């Protein structure tokens, strides 16, 4: 272990690292984390995931409007939480699927222009350019670049997080 997140990839050293839960809507989760497709999605896997750079890369880019995500720092560990798809109770359908590590976080103020922002997002973003343009107008814009380190074989449901990990039900 060298301490360089890219050189050590996929190894993560959790000691002395901050850890967070990052919730992602199902429609974005599957495209972004192609190795974390749920069993109930497998029959549609070919339709859900195309052979594109953002699906195949270890680098992932996600847009958030949750103000506290701007406080993320390089090396922070993100537990990816796929939110409920509306097909049943969140207790069973919202799950932790993956572990990532923050590479870089940028807010709207870090970009000198719309073009600068679009160029930054171009390589690893799952989002359409029209959406990126629209979202750039939002002052709460946070762009999170992360490495996709682990797709969990056993998924943790919201119920498990509430009952066993004692995570607050009001957190998300």
What do the PLM-derived regions correspond to, one by one?
Residues 68-87:
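Short coil-to-beta transition motif at edge beta-strands of beta-rich domains
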Residues 89-101:
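Short coil-to-beta-strand transition motifs
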């Amino acid at each position: 272990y060298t301490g360089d997140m890219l050189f050590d990839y996929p190894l993560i050293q959790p000691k002395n690292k901050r850890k967070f839960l990052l919730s992602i809507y199902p429609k974005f989760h599957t495209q972004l984390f192609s190795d974390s497709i749920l069993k109930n999605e497998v029959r549609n896997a070919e339709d859900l995931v195309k052979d594109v750079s953002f699906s195949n890369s270890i680098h992932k880019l996600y847009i958030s409007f949750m103000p506290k995500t701007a406080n993320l720092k390089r090396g922070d560990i993100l537990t990816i939480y796929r939110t409920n798809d509306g097909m049943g109770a969140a207790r069973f359908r919202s799950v932790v699927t993956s572990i990532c590590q923050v590479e870089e976080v940028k807010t709207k103020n870090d970009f000198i222009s719309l073009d600068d922002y679009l160029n930054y997002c171009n390589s690893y973003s799952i989002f359409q350019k029209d959406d990126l343009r629209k979202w750039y107008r939002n002052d709460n814009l946070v762009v999170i670049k992360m490495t996709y380190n682990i797709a969990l074989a056993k998924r943790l449901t919201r119920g498990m997080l509430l009952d066993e990990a004692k995570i607050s039900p009001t957190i998300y």
